[in-house]
Amino acid sequence: MSKEIALTLDSRKRLGSTYLKLTKPKVVALMLVTAIVGMSLAPVTDFPWIQASIGLIGIGLMAGSAAAFNHLIDRRIDARMARTHTRPLPSGDTNPLSVAIFAVAIGVVGFVLLYAWVNELTAWMTFLSLLGYAVVYTMYLKRATPQNIVIAGIAGAMPPLLGWTAVTGELHGNAWLLVMIIFIWTPPHFWALAIHRVEDYRKVDIPMLPVTHGIEYTKTSILLYTVLLTLVCVMPVLVGMVGFIYLFSALLLNAGFIYHAWKLKFAPEPNSAIETFKFSIYHLLALFVALLADHYIGMVLQ
């Protein structure tokens, strides 16, 4: 009897792990960090903790739903790529119908939470972001143009704005600046990975930039985008959102990103592309933590 219980528990753990993987939890976690920053920087006199918490849950569920739809739609090309062939669907850990039901279910729950307990604006904007990633990007742009990441990057850049609207119920230019940071960060982040996995993308006929325009062109594009990103990252300081702590951190982090991009272009080593990709993740996380730290330290010192 105890053996049967142990087997049942083990089976449930594996099932839970499978469905957690479908939501791309690390990606969603980073998105939620940026949403928290959007909430924290929003000008509210009495912070709505319960509303904000429900907002994070709703945004997280809908982001997880978009990720699950991505797994579902891309299952055939995932099976042929070295980076993705062990994902739940290609590996046979689950089936398309179950993934579709799961994606719809958590998406609906997330939307209802946002619509009923946060505000309609956040619910609909999060839904549009889901459509942008799962439908516009995954179903069309990814397979249609090498500018797929550039055009669809807005969908993945929305969490700071969603966090802002979750606690204020309104759009604001400062929140769009946070969106712009992620929007400009996205192409060099993904293009570095695309260089590292260029043969994978070529094999499945996905027109990523290094496949269509060549690796050297892509390296140049990455370097130019990191310079542009540095300029965009200064803008929150110029409008008075944050101060010196963030400015120093942003300049340091962007210098690191430019260094990796420069090295990738002019002094590449076998792992330069994947190292640039990995650094970009730490860059974005640290940048938004710096926004948060500057904001709260500034409040204490006032």
From Swiss-Prot:
It catalyses: heme b + (2E,6E)-farnesyl diphosphate + H2O = Fe(II)-heme o + diphosphate. Keywords: Cell inner membrane, Cell membrane, Heme biosynthesis, Membrane, Transferase, Transmembrane, Transmembrane helix. The chain crosses the membrane at residues 27-47, 49-69, 98-118, 121-141, 149-169, 175-195, 228-248, 281-301. It is found in: Cell inner membrane. It holds the Pfam family UbiA. It is an enzyme of class 2 (transferase). It is a multi-pass membrane protein. GO terms for biological process: heme O biosynthetic process. Its main location: membrane. One of its GO terms (molecular function) is protoheme IX farnesyltransferase activity. Carbon 2 of the heme B porphyrin ring is defined according to the Fischer nomenclature. Belongs to the UbiA prenyltransferase family. Protoheme IX farnesyltransferase subfamily. This is Protoheme IX farnesyltransferase 1. It comes from Vibrio parahaemolyticus serotype O3:K6 (strain RIMD 2210633).
